Amino acid sequence: KSPVTVAQFRTFVETTAYKTEAEKFGDSGVFNLEKQNWELMPGAFWQKPFGGAGNDAENNHPVTHVSWNDAVAYTNWAGKRLPTEAEWEFAARSGKNSENKFSWGNEISLDGKYFANTWQGELKTPEVKDGYLYTSPVGTFGENEAGLTDMGGNVWQWCADTYKAYPGSTAPIREDPNVKTIRSGSFFYDQYGEDSYSVSGRSMNSHETSLFNTGFRCAMDSK
């Protein structure tokens, strides 16, 4: 229904003694708003999104600083799996052949009410009209018609797939099995703007990468 939360990931770690790749590397990706650049923040990992001196991650927020490999380890433990990119988009469209731009409709906001945790303003001048500069509790902005939350904004979400060009696309994409697809967009600025939060928005990252705006959700085969 929702992205995996900090509390859920903690249960996994406490049960298995799992160490994330961010913990093994000793750092993870955080954007420094003051310096306006990405940094490998020492001590940043799923419990400390902004490094050792920062606040603890909140239990009901989506877990972040997890790589694709970490996400797969969790899903294997939980008896689930990562969704394929096609499954993710099908779910974002509530299982319909919907023409809506976003999982909830066609507008990011209406009469001052935001439908997702998304970036507003320029990179140098962030605005917090939706109430959250960084992650928000899962489900804060409600469900789509399929009963799923956070299918646009809050955190990018790992998919099972290697990132590939769509059939018929002329985009010069070199397939690399270590580069995986991410969906949903996040709370953070994206060069593609609103399109990153759309049901068709997509991006990619290497399977070892962990960032302060990337998490995951689980899928299961129907019985």
Per-region residue spans from a language model:
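Short, structured beta-strand segments at or near domain termini in extracellular proteins/domains
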Residues: F212-K223
